[in-house]
Amino acid sequence: MSESVRIVACPTCKAEVRWEPQSRYRPFCSERCRLIDLGQWASESYRVPAEEDHPPGETPPTH
């Protein structure tokens, strides 16, 4: 029984990438795209949204 190989889009350039162990840089298509993505995180171009611990308009507590 053969399984079909899943194809995903590279997050950086949108090229098709086979999702399999032989795809060295998955989900990226290449080391270049992987490093571009890493650089975006390092320069804070990408951010994970965070919720404020205090209501809007209220001054945050100081320690």
From Swiss-Prot:
Cofactor section: Zn(2+)
Lineage: superkingdom: Bacteria
InterPro entries, A to Z: DNA_gyrase_inhibitor_YacG, Znf_NHR/GATA
Cofactor binding comment, as recorded: Binds 1 zinc ion.
Gene Ontology biological process: regulation of DNA-templated transcription
GO MF annotation terms: DNA topoisomerase type II (double strand cut, ATP-hydrolyzing) inhibitor activity; zinc ion binding
Keyword Zinc: yes
Positions annotated to bind Zn(2+): 10, 13, 29, 33
Pfam annotation, one family: YacG
Keywords: Metal-binding, Zinc
Entry similarity comment: Belongs to the DNA gyrase inhibitor YacG family.
Subunit field text: Interacts with GyrB.
Function description: Inhibits all the catalytic activities of DNA gyrase by preventing its interaction with DNA. Acts by binding directly to the C-terminal domain of GyrB, which probably disrupts DNA binding by the gyrase.
Protein name: DNA gyrase inhibitor YacG
Gene name as annotated: yacG
